[in-house]
């Protein structure tokens, strides 16, 4: 299935949509896309395990059965390794999280960090690390961590979905019940993007992709993939009746990949 939506706000000149080869309904959620757009990562709705899926052929390979592996896995810049979480429970049934590294070429899985109550991926020396801790927006740069939370540090303001721009200069985040924002590494120059930009992802340094979803508290009723630019352009990329969600982006190949409510994977191909 394939069709084309022509741009109205001119974020993209055109966008084509098609179901990924071999994609079937099931317990499946999109978890990531490689920097070169050659493969995606999928997990279950409970973030158990990771699968590598060739984006062109649909060929699938199981990488790990780790609990929690599907929650924000990190793909290396060369696409050859993945850092993923491993959730375990101690003798008191307390939840602990470790980090494993998956070598895709060797097919190996090794422990990177032992399980702990709180765990962070890096020290921010090569690139700032942004993350959520106690529902607050945090950043680590050169081993120093600080609470940014530009919209307020209080129990009423909760932050989710943080990510660093490709050039490493801006932070994208979402304030629950309010909307998506962008700020600099100091938590300043705060810019509101949109209320209906949930699960936001950077497409490039000036463009953000998110979802505008509606639910009844139990199931999704509608969801469209949206594009936003920092200078205020907005474009609906998919019809809301298709209920496409949780986009992942690869601007190098002009790709936006998303998953349907039934677990099928869809690919959007963009032209600037």
Where are these regions (language model features)?
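Bacterial N-terminal signal peptides
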Residues: 1-4
């Amino acid at each position: 299935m394939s069709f084309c939506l022509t741009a109205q706000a001119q974020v993209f000149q055109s966008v084509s949509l098609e179901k990924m080869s071999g994609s079937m309904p099931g317990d499946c959620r999109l978890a990531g896309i490689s920097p070169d757009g050659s493969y995606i990562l999928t997990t279950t709705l409970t973030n158990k395990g990771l699968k590598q899926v060739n984006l062109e052929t649909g060929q699938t390979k199981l990488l790990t059965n780790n609990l929690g592996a599907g929650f924000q896995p990190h793909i290396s810049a060369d696409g050859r390794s993945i850092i993923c979480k491993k959730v375990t429970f101690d003798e008191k049934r307390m939840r602990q999280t470790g980090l494993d590294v998956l070598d895709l070429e060797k097919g190996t899985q090794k422990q990177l960090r032992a399980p702990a109550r709180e765990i962070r991926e890096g020290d921010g020396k090569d690139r700032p690390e942004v993350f959520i801790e106690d529902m607050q927006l945090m950043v680590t740069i050169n081993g120093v961590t600080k609470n940014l939370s530009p919209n307020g540090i209080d129990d009423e303001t909760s932050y989710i979905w943080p990510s660093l721009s490709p050039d490493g200069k801006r932070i994208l985040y979402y304030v629950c019940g309010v909307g998506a924002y962008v700020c600099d590494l100091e938590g300043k120059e705060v810019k509101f993007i949109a209320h209906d930009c949930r699960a936001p992802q950077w497409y490039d340094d000036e463009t953000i992709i998110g979802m505008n979803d509606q639910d009844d508290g139990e199931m999704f009723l509608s969801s469209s993939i949206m594009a936003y630019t920092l200078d205020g352009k907005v474009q609906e990329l998919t019809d809301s009746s298709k209920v496409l969600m949780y986009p992942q982006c690869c601007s190098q190949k002009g790709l936006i990949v998303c998953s349907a409510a039934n677990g099928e994977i869809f690919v959007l191909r963009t032209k600037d």
